[in-house]
């Protein structure tokens, strides 16, 4: 209203315009802009230099995973875990249908603007299914093959299960389902670290880029780093292989936007 009064005093607006303007209610505070897949938007901006892009994201699935991320973030905050990411790939089309690089994008103090999908993190136990897959494919392992879950010492390396217990003879399928460490280590010893290292590189785990000897048997227990992007694509590789689908490169863009 002060501005309107000044405009009227300087005869920039007439009296009727002034009276009509001050009688208008003040507008409400503008709604915040939607923050759908903000980390993906940032990725497109960096990789495509702001070029017009049409993503493969499914809005419904994206909304579901963002809600799930927010819900689990509230749970993890109790354990002082501030960052998480979710990536969903449709293995039949090999398109990314949901991309949540982190939670609370607007919060800078907890590193929430970091796209965790592209950030290397410890592999933990996430490589175990790849070892089982590789051994199943070559016929050196069956789901019911009994594996030893007993105390072992391999050149001074003594792996332990999370429970600190030993189960004796365990079927391979159960050892995988329970993520038992000792069977995984003995399997890797039998399969060969260099061979497994090569396989992981072949299926796209690019950040496992040091010699196999650098990792040793700890490779199967989190002794390496990988990105969620590479790991999810590698899991999609296994899924497509089992469904006998062609192995194509994962896409974030619709084909008709590639040349735009």
Task: Map each language-model feature to its residues.
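A penicillin-recognizing enzyme superfamily signal
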Residues: 55-76, 88-90, 99, 107-116, ...
